[in-house]
């Protein structure tokens, strides 16, 4: 009984050319061999068509080249949040101003609002600036709240609330503003209005 050994060889003459397929069949009993070239198969033709264009090939090479990694700052929650009193007035026709300052966060997308006694305040009462870039790709933002001092005769607490994607929970800072000492104007027939126990207003 004759026995045969089949050897398939694949050689690539050039990177942009189709591979050469040759097959050698050897009869081990008669010690005879026959080698012939195989025609291109559909797979080899497909591989030829699938060769990347020079532009695509360049993109691939650039993508596989070892490049120095750039330090990209990940999302960071605000590192500083505080509320300060800008001005306080006791004139019944004037307003007090609170400023909320938030800094050290990334990316710049952030949501800020104010609460008064745990009640969300109308956005018409405050103005929030656009985030400003700090050093190291961090951002900073301010929001100013306007408060009529005659709004309440008691100690009121105002809270600045911040929501950022890097924070697991909402962040907040509060400031209490006592407006029970606001002055009341007394009507007078002559001269400028006066405080009950003080000099006339300029």
Curated annotation (Swiss-Prot):
It comes from the Eukaryota. Residues 41-56 have a biased composition (Polar residues). This delta chain lacks the domain corresponding to the CH2 domain of human delta chain. Keywords: Immunoglobulin domain. SMART domains: IGc1 (SM00407). Residues 32-58 are annotated as: Disordered. This is Ig delta chain C region. Residues 66-178 form the Ig-like domain. InterPro entries: Ig-like_dom, Ig-like_dom_sf, Ig-like_fold, Ig/MHC_CS, Ig_C1-set, Immune_Resp_Modulators.
